[in-house]
Amino acid sequence: MNIFDELKARGLVFQTTDEAALSKALTEDMVSYYVGYDPTADSLHLGNLVLILTMKRLQMAGHKPYALVGGATGLIGDPSFKDSERSLQTKDTVTKWSGKIRSQLERFLDFENGENKAEMTNNYNWFENLTFIDFLRDVGKHFTVNYMISKDSVKSRMESGISYTEFAYQIMQGYDFYELNQLHNVTLQLGGSDQWGNMTAGTELLRRKANKQGHVITIPLITDSTGKKFGKSEGNAIWLDADKTSPYEMYQFWLNVDDADAVKMLKIFTFLSLEEIAEIEEQFEAARHERLAQKVLAREVVSLVHGKAAYEQAVKTSEILFGGGDLRQLDAKSILTGLKAAPQHQVTDDEDLTLVELLISAGIAPSKRQAREDITNGAIYINGERVQALDYVITDSDKIENRLTVIRRGKKKNFVLTY
């Protein structure tokens, strides 16, 4: 199976230009290709990861990747299918975010070895000294207004209004393709399905200005079985930066993927072969309650993004938090991350309460009678250890890093005491 057929088998091809010619090129030649990343945040996220891994698949097949950071286009903002104008970022912010994108991409792409080693460039390099007059004469003249407003990404904004700044974005992205072709013989662009209009502006400019054929592959919007955009947890993006989304949070995200989506996501987000995935699917369907596909997803993706050690720590954290282990084996940060949704109670320095009084003060038990019953019945745990003494008082040894204590009532209800 050639790389193009594999991408299709994994559900990673939505639209292409001239599929036969593209498949032939990917089979016979080393193709130079690129993906653009506008620095619109200080970290890439799970949606970006689909494209990053697709870049890696092509590199592993012998093709040469170029990661284009949108130092110039990031100052403008892509209007594609957005309801309103993006906020413009300062040049300093865009420069700072561009640097972070590179460091994240280096985890996945090989920038060091071989003829097809990855390279990174920034479109600010060619836009910085391009005058407005030159841009209109050398680039703008190749695009008719009719062509530009026919793009679905622009049509969706015609009623609400679109500034000339954002309207011109597709020409800027098209010019990126032209420049990369002239500088590095790049002939293929990858992007999300919402980028089709901007990307084909590039193939059009390449045809008109250089009489060359360029290719485009768009990757489908990744959705779950209900049709919702995949890659968010409770409305929040899953970031690749561990300071924004911890390895533990990413691990839990993958563990909680719906059964209907798990095998699909294995094809998209892992480098397991399709044969291996078929075997996992067979075992998974035979015993869905064991959640094998989700466990493999969590292992593969967290290890890929954050490393094996971070994955193993996430497993350990999960087992201790939800398996009844000794929480003192974990650091305070891991506990607070894992129990983010648990109620918290600030204990003041002058509180020296018995466990019964503390359960009431923290809202864990509604009354002294209920608190005593919970303790004597063995339903109260401090940092994972059962406590049945009614006169028990929290001591420094119960304070993890002198910052917190976890009280569990029953099997699952956790409360965090902070100091």
UniProtKB/Swiss-Prot annotation:
- The reply to whether Ligase figures as a keyword in the UniProt entry is yes
Return the GO cellular component terms, semicolon-separated: cytosol
Residues involved in L-tyrosine binding:
Y34, Y169, Q173
What is this enzyme's EC? Answer: 6.1.1.1
Which residues are recorded as binding ATP? K232
Q: What's the main place this protein lives?
A: cytoplasm
Disulfide bonds listed in the record = none
Under catalytic activity, the entry for this protein gives: tRNA(Tyr) + L-tyrosine + ATP = L-tyrosyl-tRNA(Tyr) + AMP + diphosphate + H(+)
Name the residue ranges of motif: 'HIGH' region: 39-48
UniProt GO MF annotations: ATP binding; RNA binding; tyrosine-tRNA ligase activity
Q: The organism sits in which domain of life?
A: Bacteria
Positions occupied by motif 'KMSKS' region:
229-233
Assembly and binders:
Homodimer.
The text of the family note is:
Belongs to the class-I aminoacyl-tRNA synthetase family. TyrS type 1 subfamily.
Q: What is this protein called?
A: Tyrosine--tRNA ligase
Q: Which organism is it from?
A: Lactococcus lactis subsp. lactis (strain IL1403)
